[in-house]
Amino acid sequence: KEEPPKKEKPKKQRILKAVLTCFLIGVITVAIVAGSFLVYAFTMVDGTVDQNLNDLKLNFTTTVYVENDKGDWEEYQRLHGMYNRIWVDYDQQAIERGDEDYKGIPANLANAFIAIEDKGFETHYGVNWKRTFGALLNEFFHFKDKFGGATITQQAVKNLTDDRKQDAGRKVREIMRARSLETKYTKDVILECYLNTIPMGHGTYGVQVAANYYFGKEVDELTLVECACLASITKAPSF
């Protein structure tokens, strides 16, 4: 007797099987890549940040004052090296107390940068993994949306170390160093470092020099709108 012809599987089943196979291959590939990344990160990458943030302000622009004919002190000259930066403190406790003598970075400016650059700054531990993987996938699939993977902590690390190498290990080093920085310093100290080292266009670095350059004001004199404008410059520092 002749054997009856084998029934072909429905088209939907074949498609489902193909999709599941591709999914499993993708999961296995991601697992292998993630495992390799972790091995590389923990064995080959220097995740330390040598810079002491408490000493960082000593390397900034020095302002020289002279006494005029009326006996008042006025700015005579600013002395700086490669980077024109003036350090200003960020003290959230003084802001909350309503300290009238506080002349540091205003809350509106700090909040504007967090809102634009890193909404999860207060809750993450140096790295926003969702954004990081989104940026990684965007490198391969070129989505219409742009993914900024770096957190404020990671950007502070980049400004501190000046690590601009375009190699596979740079992002890994940045992530490891950001995690390390979060274990050593408070969020306020990290934010203060970031706001004082960020490039703001036209050779200015940090929010104090940027406030002087763009608005002719001290940083504590900025209005809410001016704070928002400064924060938006980070998206286009040649503004």
Which sequence ranges carry the predicted segments?
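Juxtamembrane regions of bacterial inner-membrane/periplasmic proteins
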Residues: 1-239
